[in-house]
Amino acid sequence: MEVVYEDNHIIIVNKQSGEIVQGDKTGDRPLSDIVKDYLKDKYAKPGAVFLGVVHRLDRPVSGLVVFARTSKALSRLNKMFAEGEVHKTYWAIVKNTPKESEGTLTHWLVRNEKQNKSYAYTSEKPNAKKAILKYKVIGHSDNYCLLEVQLMTGRHHQIRCQLAAMGCPIKGDLKYGAPRSNPDGSISLMSRRVEFVHPVSKETIIAEAPLPHDPLWQSFKP
């Protein structure tokens, strides 16, 4: 586990693809438990350690996850995430290059619980939720394109679904149209950067995740 930022109220860690943020029906050990153990050992805390989960990343996605270390930070961060005051920047390696080098995508997403998949429509549908993101082309390799993505809304599989609807599926994302999987089971999407006002100290916090060790990711290193 890699800690990117830590203080008395929050801890930001770099999640690896394949890890789950919070416990689920698979029974796999979640990142939240790993962070709790880290805090317990580091500070020699007796008894249970408080750790609040304020947001999640899909299992095959890597990058920054923010946790709260106090109940005060948890309640304030929950409000900040809900009100769009936490600015998250994602990087995605995609097949195909968008027609426009930057733009805004607006779709209505319908979630299929049984398939654990979202479907994008260009107009309103029953039970659909409006999804908006901004993207920008920031790099190219021989066969792929690197996009920087900022979410204006937070929907189920939003980036994966909307980029696929644009004709640019994320590398390795079989569920949304990639031709083949990545060898390690990841998809080439990461939570690269997070910026927000600290819920207690009110300082501006900016954290950035290192790129995955995969050679393709490393080829995009600034």
Language-model features: locations:
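RNA pseudouridine synthases
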Residues: 1-222
